[in-house]
Amino acid sequence: MTLFEELKWRGLIHNITDEAVIDKINKGGLTFYVGTDPTGDSLHVGHLLVFIFAKRLEQAGHHPLILIGGATGCIGDPKPTAERKLLTKEQTDHNAKCLYEQAKRLFNCEMVNNYDWTHNIDILTFLRTYGKFFNVNYMINKETVKSRLDSGI
């Protein structure tokens, strides 16, 4: 059984948009990322499925990259029912370091933090450069946003 067939059999791949990716998955040597926000200083059960999937890819010869959402961690991330407590830069830095220390025990990996390439972008530059790619109708129709709007959060 190939790696792709195994991942599909396990229900970890639902469909693909490009058949060429099958050979790349089976061959190995791809770099992939596992992303997480530094909302806490420890890995937890919510990370389990993604990390097991990542470990399987690593065992097949692919290279994991841990992507920490330091910028997202400072802003907060919408939850369906409540506001998330905003964390300070110091808290997200501490949490990111702790998460990376734990992840590197599981993987031979590097870590990048999206805060590093986003913190110097001013709001006008961001909106002009990236805002055009955000569709407000799409965002409003997301269930998380809908439920927050309906509940007044």
Placement of each model-derived feature along the sequence:
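NTP-dependent nucleotidyl-transfer catalytic core
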Residues: M1-I153
